[in-house]
UniProtKB/Swiss-Prot annotation:
Belongs to the anhydro-N-acetylmuramic acid kinase family. ATP binds at residues 9-16. This is Anhydro-N-acetylmuramic acid kinase. It comes from Bacillus cereus (strain Q1). Catalyzes the specific phosphorylation of 1,6-anhydro-N-acetylmuramic acid (anhMurNAc) with the simultaneous cleavage of the 1,6-anhydro ring, generating MurNAc-6-P. Is required for the utilization of anhMurNAc either imported from the medium or derived from its own cell wall murein, and thus plays a role in cell wall recycling.
Length: 382
């Protein structure tokens, strides 16, 4: 089957689309990436998403309209990846669309029950591309008592399980998440959970203090020094003390967190603040490894992926934090995979599993009561 996986994450960089060919289903799936592209959001669309994400500034009329606008954006992104690959849209069998997360409530709080909302109307995508769309991957896991995240572990087992090596896959997108993948000869369980901020705080600080979308290659962070006072404040965040399985998002580490941090520590240089929040991402990752993984698993390899793996300063901070451990640290590209395409490929794989009616959540990662088939299916017009 030819499937387009579509992902728009918490970083708001744009729409990632992976065109893949998948043979079979389940753990024996054969997956080949044909082409990958990122379609940036228009400035007006990005502004509307940012407004929709704000509890103070959002409204139901905006979210209702944006749901359909993003459906068109996602459909156009699928057309773009096919055009770039010189691949006929009519050959496409399936689209797996994650959607744009507007709010994620992983656990009950007050009178709010656990819930999640991703928008980007699948009916619009299906109609505009004349292709079956699978979307809303998180909701069934949450209906089964899970947190709806992380969802990539299933695809990571298919792609990265090694005959003899125990691996950690660390994704560094807007949020960081880790998947523990025991070797094929191991009888230990796959586990996964969010490790805290990935690029989210780094990018927000860059935009506010340097008027740059992100810290390219970590060049600015390399110039500053870590401020212990700020790092201690960050590392005391309640999320870091929670036991897995757990998930987080912009609600905990987004604009409000950055606003409070910058107001509290405005006396420090902007370079030192950026260096410190970069160290916070690295330290939160290392903290979770040492607290929740390394005491129980003998890890041979750590594989870093996502946009954060291109931040050389961040990667070196992670390496330094793990210098006393026996594991070898790689970037996805070191082993022949694409850091950028990883999550989009994951949702193509999940769409394939749903098409074949196979459960594809990992209860040990999400906390769900049972394995369930993920996603809603939307057929194109006849």
């Amino acid at each position: 089957m030819y499937i387009a996986g579509v992902m728009s994450g918490t970083s708001l960089d744009g729409i990632d689309v992976a065109l893949v060919r998948i043979e079979g289903s389940g753990v024996d799936s054969k997956v080949k990436l044909i082409h990958f592209t990122t379609v940036p959001f228009r400035n007006d669309i990005k502004s509307e998403i940012q407004q929709a994400l704000s509890i103070e500034n959002s409204n139901v009329q905006l979210i209702c309209s944006l749901n359909f606008k993003l459906g068109l954006c996602f459909a156009n992104a699928v057309k773009e990846v096919c055009k770039e690959a010189n691949f006929s849209l009519e050959q496409l069998d399936l689209i797996g669309s994650h959607g744009q997360t507007i709010y994620h409530q992983p656990k009950p709080e007050g009178n709010m029950i656990a819930s999640t909302l991703q928008i980007g109307e699948p009916a619009v995508i299906a109609y505009d591309t004349n292709t079956t769309v699978i979307s809303n991957f998180r909701t069934m896991d949450m209906a089964a008592g899970g947190q709806g995240a992380p969802l990539v572990p299933y695809s990571e087992v298919i792609l990265y399980r090694d005959p003899s090596k125990n691996r950690l896959l660390q994704n560094i997108g807007g949020i960081g998440n880790v998947t523990v993948i025991p070797s094929q000869k191991s009888d230990q369980n796959v586990i996964a959970f969010d490790t805290g901020p990935g690029n989210m705080i780094i990018d927000e600080v860059c935009q506010r203090l340097f008027q740059l979308p992100y810290d390219q290659n970590g060049e600015i962070a390399e110039q500053g020094e870590v401020v212990d006072e700020i790092l201690t404040y960050c590392m005391n965040h309640p999320f870091l003390k929670m036991n897995p399985p757990k998930s987080t998002g912009r609600e905990q580490f987004g604009e409000e967190f950055v606003s409070q941090l910058l107001k509290r520590y405005e006396k420090y240089s902007k370079e030192n603040i950026l260096t410190t929040v970069t160290m916070f991402t690295a330290s939160s990752i290392v903290h979770h490894y040492k607290g929740f993984i390394l005491p129980y698993y003998e890890i041979d390899e750590v594989i870093l992926g996502g946009g954060g793996s291109y931040n050389d300063t961040l990667v070196e901070m992670i390496r330094y934090g793990l210098k006393d451990e026996k594991c070898t640290i790689f970037i996805q590209e070191d082993i022949g995979y694409s850091s950028e395409a990883k999550e989009a490929i994951a949702f193509a794989i999940l769409a394939n599993e749903t098409y074949h009616r196979n459960p594809s959540n990992v209860p040990s990662a999400t906390g769900a009561k049972k394995s369930v088939v993920l996603g809603n299916v939307t057929y194109p017009s006849i």
